[in-house]
Amino acid sequence: MAEISRIQYEMEYTEGISQRMRVPEKLKVAPPNADLEQGFQEGVSNASVIMQVPERIVVAGNNEDIPFSRPADLDLIQSTPFKPLALKTPPRVLTLSERPLDFLDLERPAPTPQNEEIRAVGRLKRERSMSENAVRQNGQLVKTDSMYGISNIDAMIEGTSEDMTVVDAASLRRQIIKLNRRLQLLEEENKERAKREMVMYSITVAFWLLNSWLWFRR
């Protein structure tokens, strides 16, 4: 129900707007005046036929038609020819040794011997600095390689020493086990030898006692 009433209200609103609002036939800017109104009505037929965009807008007061000359700056702009701009395509790779920074100049002065000498000296300085930088970088690379090799050797020595300690501990443990076994065998042999000696000693003593008793019986 609310939707139907809303649609009806919108239809009535749009119908009222279309009936009451009209585009005016003319727009009045000046205050109401009989002379202006009459002149305006006389010139409406001519002014309403073709509408042209004026060349310039001139603001004048008190209904005065002040003659203005063509602006000087417009004549100057139209009379001044445009110079073509010289644009150069930037190179893909910027190399200071081959292309110095003065390649951006569009118009170079005539080369002089002094300028050539200055450029040659600057080029030599750049090449010397580049070679020194290359040698320095190579020296740093050699140093880093040597340091890396030394560190690798130290790491290998430490690793081998650790491995050696592990191997030594294992071998020592095996040797200790072997020594324990040999000591146990020696102890058992000593016990058996002591038993044999006791038996032999008792037999010898018994033999001598028997011989002495027999000798006394005779």
Swiss-Prot record:
The residue ranges for the Mitochondrial intermembrane side of the membrane come to 217-218
Q: Does the keyword Coiled coil apply?
A: yes
Domain of life where this protein originates: Eukaryota
> InterPro entries, from UniProt?
Mff-like_dom, Mff/Tango-11
Q: Where in the cell is it found?
A: Mitochondrion outer membrane; Peroxisome; Cytoplasmic vesicle, Secretory vesicle, Synaptic vesicle
Modified positions (Phosphothreonine) in chain numbering: T89
Cytoplasmic-facing ranges? 1-198
Q: Which UniProt keywords apply?
A: Coiled coil, Cytoplasmic vesicle, Membrane, Mitochondrion, Mitochondrion outer membrane, Peroxisome, Phosphoprotein, Synapse, Transmembrane, Transmembrane helix
Belongs to which family? Answer: Belongs to the Tango11 family.
Q: What does this protein do?
A: Plays a role in mitochondrial and peroxisomal fission. Promotes the recruitment and association of the fission mediator dynamin-related protein 1 (DNM1L) to the mitochondrial surface. May be involved in regulation of synaptic vesicle membrane dynamics by recruitment of DNM1L to clathrin-containing vesicles.
Does this entry carry the keyword Phosphoprotein? yes
Q: Which GO terms describe its biological process?
A: mitochondrial fission; positive regulation of mitochondrial fission; protein targeting to mitochondrion
UniProt protein name? Mitochondrial fission factor
Give the originating organism: Bos taurus (Bovine)
Quaternary assembly: Homodimer. Interacts with DNM1L. Interacts with C11orf65/MFI; the interaction inhibits MFF interaction with DNM1L.
**Which classification does the entry list for the species?**
Eukaryota, Metazoa, Chordata, Craniata, Vertebrata
List the PANTHER family. Answer: MITOCHONDRIAL FISSION FACTOR, TRANSPORT AND GOLGI ORGANIZATION PROTEIN 11
GO CC, any one term: peroxisome
Q: Which gene encodes it?
A: MFF
Residue numbers of Phosphoserine PTMs: S129, S131, S146, S171
Q: Where are the transmembrane segments?
A: 199-216
Q: Name one GO molecular function term.
A: protein homodimerization activity
- Ranges in coiled-coil conformation: 167-198
The UniProt entry lists membrane topology as:
Single-pass type IV membrane protein
